[in-house]
């Protein structure tokens, strides 16, 4: 796998840089050049060649063996989020898949990074779905199991109205589906309409998508 410091990663990012520009909207804002998961170079049509967002993700993702426990290969997206062009491409692509939501739910902790960026792009609010014990009470709690142990997620039971709102769950990685499944149950207990989930990376071999069916799931890269 190529990383940000390699020539391949630099090539991908240099092409992406030509595909992001600014246009007037009162104050200047980013012009959108992401179409159906492809990053278009400036001036190119939708029919011309483009760099896949999946290639961007792959070029800036680091594999870490035996983390956080032995036997687990961790997908570290920190280099992707730290790169302004990589983050911009991922934000645009996820925002496209979350279109129509009036609230975005970001999952603790790396999901916060992309969820906040997507919410800003869509001009909607972001709800922090926290790990157990991180929020002041009263809270709604949901226990679940993931590939390396049990965990708890929580949202505020007061102060934020989620009932009747169309929510899309945003996270960095989809593995077994345990985290997103628990988030969905938590939101639905609060009365939300969970429209789908969007993630940066899907670990296809762990069958998380099947575990979440029939919830619509969108991923930018399947590894």
UniProtKB/Swiss-Prot annotation:
GO biological process: adenine salvage; AMP salvage; purine ribonucleoside salvage
Catalytic activity: AMP + diphosphate = 5-phospho-alpha-D-ribose 1-diphosphate + adenine
Known EC number: 2.4.2.7
Cellular component terms per the entry's GO annotation: cytoplasm
Keywords: Cytoplasm, Glycosyltransferase, Purine salvage, Transferase
A Pfam family that the UniProt record links to this protein: Pribosyltran
Coiled coil: none
GO molecular-function terms, A-Z: adenine binding; adenine phosphoribosyltransferase activity; AMP binding
Annotated metabolic or biological route of this protein: Purine metabolism; AMP biosynthesis via salvage pathway; AMP from adenine: step 1/1
Transmembrane segments: none
Localization terms from the record: Cytoplasm
SUPFAM superfamilies linked: PRTase-like
RNA-binding as UniProt keyword: no
Function of the protein: Catalyzes a salvage reaction resulting in the formation of AMP, that is energically less costly than de novo synthesis.
Subunit structure: Homodimer.
Protein known as: Adenine phosphoribosyltransferase
Gene designation per UniProt: apt
